[in-house]
Amino acid sequence: VDVLENPKWEKKLSRHYYHTKEVIQGRKNKGVMKGHTNNPKGRDGLRSGKVIFNEVHQYENYDNIKVFTTGQGKVAQPRRGYFTSNGDISDGPLDDYLARGRRILFEGEADNGFLPFICCLNDKAQVHHPENWQMANPSLPYLPELYAEVEDEYREWLEHPEQNGDFMTKRMGIRSGAKEIA
């Protein structure tokens, strides 16, 4: 909704979309996009055509995922997307998705429509060479502001690694205690 309220885009986008804080609707095809909170209660019965899970590293279990995905199939051609950085919650859904992705990519397991796109350094030592950062952040060459932010975070991490552990986890895709990724 924020992009629809941005003065830079508001006029152009309002011709194509109607929006409130809860819903965005296409004016031409009447397609509706709704956001939901992280509360699984009362969500049974949804008829979702597309479900996007953001920041999957925060999910401790499958409660929310099950509620939103069991409604799929009631609508033709259902789709799911899982988008996240790495995180510190072990043995949660993210670990399962990463393991499945590695089996698909490296062991030949059938994908069944699951497209893993995993971006991370191969080992911790690579972090000291900025040319490797693109492995964990493919958009760095196109976003100079992001590159500058990652450089700042890297310097802070070098000075105080114990206080800035999120740098390795979220920016470089390597959890604390992890030795190698691939």
What do these predicted ranges mean?
Residues 2-49:
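Inter-Walker segment of RecA-like/P-loop motor cores
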Residues 54-58:
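Walker B catalytic acidic pair
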Residues 45-46, 61-63:
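Extended hydrophobic-aromatic, low-complexity segments
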